[in-house]
């Protein structure tokens, strides 16, 4: 038996929709059904309490974590699906999640493909579009059946959505939900990290699709602070895969070997592994707390790339990734030479740096300022600043030949465009206006 534990925090209408959802999709004879209510609507509580086919845990005043823990203790199913009421998961999707969990030893929790490790999944794009392949519950049911034919799963370092299947006993052994957190995103992230610490990976099932009614996920600044205190890590910074860099790599190359400098908690390396399970993935990360997470799925070491002495790595890598790293180095010129020696013949580096020639920097200087910030081009931790030309020169001096140069841009207002046009009129003929639009430069360069 599977237990369905549905978390509600809204009004009477949400409660009515939740009842209909369970009644139409999860029959009482096959599933144990639990409502966990943590809202403030007495009418919703009364309605749910009168439902003879489900058990209600009234968590008003107790908090989400404590109420879900009570439901976990009460549940009888070997597996339990915890889901916020904003997610609609059809039985076909649940079966796909069960299938992937059963096919791998030691799996902790399985989530649907709301979001994949390397960005928004194609099915989520479809559901968000106006021409989504379903318009009602019946259409969603058919679509879920089609998607459920897909096999396979991707590893996740963390999940954000409160919609996951887990073994009840595994959750109990882990200690359940951490009551130091009060919102679902950090409750889920915390579960994932504790499971990884126990060497029990988290998966996203490719055949499971969930519709999400609410686009916004609630974030609590107090939970963010509690998370930093507990783990010494920051969400999302430490957990975001660099999909912009991965898009320029041949991830299917046989015997692929990748090194990421500044890999944080390893989300990008894990995305490489998902795309190519045979890939050899390595990381360099100075933050020991982040490295401890990444070491569960990659070979990660704390090394200084400016004084790198790793002869066993010479000529080893197809790709070396440096996503927003170079600007933090004291001697990026020596570091790049050291890293170039680690590439195979024809191997590539993929590097991104903020563009100090962005129009916003000019605007600030014309106002008489050069103000360091907590993030962005003038991040207070940046030691070096680059234009496109200086980045290319850095790579050239390390024996690397640029093959692809591409900018990242930020939204620009009409006033911004007018200011850029004024600046562009002052540029020499060999410097293009694109230099002013680029917020960041990314370069793929091959070892000569």
What are the residue ranges of the model-derived segments?
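Short, acidic, metal-binding catalytic loop of nucleotide-sugar glycosyltransferases
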Residues: 20-30
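Glycine-rich, basic loop-to-helix element that forms the pyrophosphate-binding segment
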Residues: 59-75
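Short aromatic/hydrophobic "clamp" motif used to bind/position activated sugar donors
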Residues: 80
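Conserved donor NDP-sugar-binding/catalytic core segment of glycosyltransferases
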Residues: 92-129, 355
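A recurrent flexible, glycine/aromatic-enriched loop bordering the glycosyltransferase active site
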Residues: 135, 143-166
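S-adenosyl-L-methionine-dependent methyltransferase catalytic module, highlighting the catalytic core
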Residues: 150, 154, 179, 330-344, ...
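A short, conserved alpha-helix in the catalytic core of glycosyltransferases
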Residues: 157-175, 180-208
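Conserved N-terminal segment of class I S-adenosyl-L-methionine
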Residues: 217-315, 319, 333-336, 367, ...
């Amino acid at each position: 038996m599977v237990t369905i534990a549905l978390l509600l925090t809204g009004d009477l209408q949400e409660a009515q929709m939740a009842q209909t959802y369970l009644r139409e999709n999860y029959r009482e004879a096959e599933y144990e059904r639990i409502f966990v209510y943590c809202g403030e609507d007495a009418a919703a509580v009364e309605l749910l309490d009168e439902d003879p086919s489900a058990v209600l845990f009234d968590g008003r005043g107790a908090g989400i974590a404590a109420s879900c823990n009570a439901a976990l203790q009460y549940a009888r199913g070997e597996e339990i699906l915890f889901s916020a009421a904003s997610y609609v998961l059809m039985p076909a999707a649940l079966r796909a999640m069960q299938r992937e969990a059963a096919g791998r030893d030691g799996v902790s929790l399985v989530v649907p493909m709301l979001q994949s490790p390397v960005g928004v999944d194609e099915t989520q794009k479809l559901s968000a579009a106006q021409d989504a392949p379903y318009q009602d519950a019946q259409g969603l049911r058919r679509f879920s059946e089609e998607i459920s034919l897909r096999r396979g799963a991707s590893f996740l370092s963390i999940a954000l959505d409160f919609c996951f299947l887990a073994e009840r006993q595994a959750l109990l052994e882990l200690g359940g939900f951490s009551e130091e957190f009060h919102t679902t995103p950090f409750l889920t992230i915390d579960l994932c990290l504790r499971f990884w610490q126990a060497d029990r990976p988290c998966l996203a099932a490719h055949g499971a699709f969930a519709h999400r009614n609410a686009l916004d996920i609630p974030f609590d600044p107090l939970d963010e602070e509690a998370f930093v205190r507990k783990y010494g890590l920051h969400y999302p910074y430490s957990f975001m895969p660099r999909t912009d860099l991965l898009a320029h790599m041949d991830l299917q190359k046989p015997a692929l070997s990748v090194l990421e400098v500044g890999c944080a908690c390893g989300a990008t390396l894990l995305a490489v592994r998902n795309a190519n399970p045979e890939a050899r993935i390595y990381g360099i990360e100075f933050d020991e707390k982040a490295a401890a997470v990444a070491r569960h799925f990659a070979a990660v070491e704390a090394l200084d790339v400016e004084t790198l002495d790793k002869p066993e790595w010479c000529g080893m890598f197809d790709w070396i990734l440096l996503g927003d790293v170079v600007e933090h180095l004291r001697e990026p010129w020596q570091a790049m030479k050291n890293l170039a020696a680690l590439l195979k013949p024809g191997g590539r580096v993929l590097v991104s740096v903020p563009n100090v020639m962005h129009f916003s920097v000019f605007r600030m200087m014309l106002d008489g300022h050069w103000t360091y910030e907590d993030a962005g081009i003038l991040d207070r931790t940046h030691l070096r600043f680059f234009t496109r030309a200086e980045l290319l020169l850095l790579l050239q001096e390390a024996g690397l030949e640029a093959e692809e140069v591409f900018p990242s841009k930020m939204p620009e207002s009409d006033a911004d465009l007018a200011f850029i046009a004024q600046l562009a009129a002052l540029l020499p003929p060999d410097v293009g206006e694109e230099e002013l639009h680029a917020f960041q430069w990314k370069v793929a360069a091959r070892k000569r």
